[in-house]
């Protein structure tokens, strides 16, 4: 197996190595291993776009993460910048976005953010990749009392809407009419809400 991480995470055809449930499980375990050092229970924000394979990968990643004692904050379909923002604002140790950005719909990928919402440093990415490729780490699973928990964050959209509004404070968009075509992408649900909250007639 060759190098997994490219310039923007791990990408490829869905259900073809490396974008498989088996690899996603190992990615989750490896992320939890790297970020799980210390006494506190680590937590990760996990989002996705609207690709069909996102549900499959979300389930596998979550299984790997919680099996190693990491708590998962699932925010559902959200734009990539929203997941980056929520990672920082919710005090997570890292964030994961399941997306292949502009790639065809039958592709998918796994993108990881550091606690500040930015791209992982190369050395951290290399450590995660090492554990994915070289170590099964099955003997390091947490005991049954230390398995992590997965939470669905119901107000994730509201949190990002408030952030978006605050980023253009003192500017009114009232009186503007807009037609939005989100192409069934990650912003399909939240974009109209943000524009309406800013006074736009959508």
Give a label for each model feature.
Residues 9, 48-50, 100, 199-202:
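Short, small-residue-rich loop/turn micro-motifs
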Residues 21, 54-55, 81, 122, ...:
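Loop/helix-junction capping segments adjacent to catalytic residues or to phosphate/diphosphate-binding pockets
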Residues 13, 108-202:
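Gly/Ser/Thr-enriched, mixed-charge loops and adjacent short helices
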Residues 4, 72-74, 95, 150-151, ...:
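Conserved beta-strand scaffold positions in the cores of enzyme catalytic domains, especially
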Residues 1-63, 67-68, 146-178:
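An N-terminal, well-structured beta->alpha segment
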Residues 32, 39-116:
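Ferredoxin-reductase
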